[in-house]
């Protein structure tokens, strides 16, 4: 997996501000090419942690450099599943991502035969299991993504954040989940490479927002305690 590192800043905004911001973003940025007709896609992620929940506690403690793993797919489509390693170093985030099959994803969860494959991705998943990483929590949300080529900018608005303990089929579209964000809230994320272009910065400055170290993973675990 090849890592891509970039700036990542997160905010909590109101749903009202989210609607206004989507309107403004459409005038300057392009929607991600993979969105549905309404400009969004549905994301399901399964986060892993070890038996001591190290990834969770490092985030809560504010450890500067930390790592977590997840399996992710979109719109409940199992034809494109990714295994992702997310790393954080202050305001910088990195992501390494590889495509895996549904068979391999399910084998990781059950310890199935596919993990004995010699393929690199299978070996990576087998190594995670051997090191004690296990499914921790299911995270669902709807994302409205926008891109701007200069600075490789990506602005996303996440709504309908919901969670469940992982006790079900990862691909069950009727999994019983509970809401995580306070009513009327959304998450705004801004990612870019070396700099944030002035037009995008000016657009975002017009939004009432509260910067915070939002972690969907830790928020979801907290809700389930």
Task: State what each model feature region is.
Residues 1-225:
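Phosphate-end processing signature that detects enzymes handling 5′-triphosphorylated RNA
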């Amino acid at each position: 997996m090849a890592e891509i590192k970039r700036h990542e800043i997160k905010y909590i905004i109101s749903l009202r501000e989210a609607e206004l911001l989507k309107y403004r973003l459409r005038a300057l940025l392009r929607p991600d090419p993979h969105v549905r007709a309404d400009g969004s896609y549905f994301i399901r992620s399964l986060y892993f942690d070890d038996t001591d929940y190290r990834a969770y506690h490092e985030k809560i403690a504010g450890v500067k450099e930390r790592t977590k793993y997840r399996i992710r797919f979109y719109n409940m489509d199992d034809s494109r599943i990714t295994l992702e390693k997310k790393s954080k170093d202050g305001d910088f985030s990195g992501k390494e991502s590889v495509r895996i099959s549904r068979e391999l994803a399910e084998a990781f969860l059950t310890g199935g035969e596919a993990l004995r494959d010699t393929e690199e991705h299978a070996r990576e998943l087998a190594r995670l299991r051997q090191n004690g990483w296990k499914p921790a929590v299911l995270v669902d949300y709807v994302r409205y993504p926008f891109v701007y080529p200069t600075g490789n900018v990506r602005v996303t608005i996440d709504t309908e954040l919901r969670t469940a303990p992982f006790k079900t089929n990862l691909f069950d579209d009727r999994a019983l989940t509970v809401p995580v964000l306070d009513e009327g809230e959304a998450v705004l994320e801004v990612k870019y490479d070396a700099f944030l272009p002035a037009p995008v910065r000016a657009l975002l400055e017009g939004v009432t927002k509260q910067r915070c170290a939002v972690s969907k993973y830790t928020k979801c675990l907290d809700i389930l305690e």
